[in-house]
Amino acid sequence: MPINIPKDLPAKEILEQENIFVMDEERAYSQDIRPLNIIILNLMPEKEKAETQLLRLLGNSPLQVNVTFLRPATHEPKTTSKHHLEQFYTIFPHIRHRKFDGMIITGAPVEQLPFEEVTYWDELTDIMEWTKTNVTSTLHICWGAQAGLYYHYGIPKYPLPEKCFGVFNHTVEAKNVKLLRGFDDVFRMPHSRHTDVKREDIEKVPDLTILSMSDKAGVCLVASNDGRRIFLTGHPEYDATTLKEEYERDLAKGLPIHIPESYFPNDDPSQPPLNTWRSHANLLFVNWLNYYVYQETPYEWE
């Protein structure tokens, strides 16, 4: 089934060219079924790229999904046009009265700041508190995962000696978990971050279960016991070339950066990288939508 998105959203044409099933609002409203309402708090600097990446994964399930894009009202993005934000995004005061079946909180390029120094931290904590009563399941990605673990459970983040940057192998730590249903014993996922959370901190929290680990990238996937909060430290939504673009950007800025690990063929940046994580990325999102959102959300919110 398709994702339901605004007719003029730039991602629509890209997704249609990739044979992703999308539907504009006029067609969706004529169908007599209950779609899932998913809200995406997009904190990424290149919002249009993040939109396409996430919609690509949300559109690969048998469920119809209505998507609402949310941005912080207390932060003015520098890399997304005001017109785009006004046309396709809303702010928290406009939707806080609503109920949503699922939510995604993306990463953000603020991980080296203390949480409380992020300009929109107070607003983000209001949103995360609101999810406890107004969202069936929330998927937190990268910095969003670190922020969620810190807010909900007091788990700190730690600076890494060098950036965790590349595509890494991960193992399934928890058996018979619906989120990882159909996963191989070992799967790959991109990471791009300067900070980390520690396994021992998470294991001290009875309400949390570590679902997946990586020998090199550390904790990958954590879930609350009721499935209402999922924390993902990697970036399964990334395109094949996203790490390449980040690498070239940092090189151009003169920042200390190493070649993304296990990414370029023969570690040669002149060779085009291959996407080796796409199938598990799609499976992860389908499992989340089906088992943690669709199967758990009420047909009619009270």
Swiss-Prot record:
- Name the pathway it acts in: Amino-acid biosynthesis; L-methionine biosynthesis via de novo pathway; O-acetyl-L-homoserine from L-homoserine: step 1/1
Q: Where would you find this protein in the cell? A: Cytoplasm
Assign the protein's first listed, main location to one coarse class.
cytoplasm
Q: What CDD domains does the entry give?
A: GATase1_HTS
Reaction catalysis annotation: L-homoserine + acetyl-CoA = O-acetyl-L-homoserine + CoA
The GO annotation for biological process reads: L-methionine biosynthetic process from homoserine via O-succinyl-L-homoserine and cystathionine
In the record, what terms sit under GO molecular function?
homoserine O-acetyltransferase activity; homoserine O-succinyltransferase activity
- Keyword hit for Metal-binding: no
Q: Where are the transmembrane segments?
A: none
Residues with site note (Important for acyl-CoA specificity): E111
Keyword Membrane present in the record's keywords: the answer is no
Q: In this chain's numbering, which residues are marked as the site (Important for substrate specificity)?
A: S192
Give the EC number(s) under which this enzyme is classified: 2.3.1.31
Which class of enzymes does this protein belong to? transferase
Q: Which GO terms describe its cellular component?
A: cytoplasm
Q: Where does substrate bind?
A: K163, S192, R249
Active site per the UniProt annotation: C142 (acyl-thioester intermediate), H235 (proton acceptor), E237
Alphabetically ordered keywords of this record:
Acyltransferase, Amino-acid biosynthesis, Cytoplasm, Methionine biosynthesis, Transferase
- Job description of the protein: Transfers an acetyl group from acetyl-CoA to L-homoserine, forming acetyl-L-homoserine.
**Family affiliation:** Belongs to the MetA family.
The name this protein carries in UniProt is Homoserine O-acetyltransferase
Q: Which organism is it from?
A: Geobacillus kaustophilus
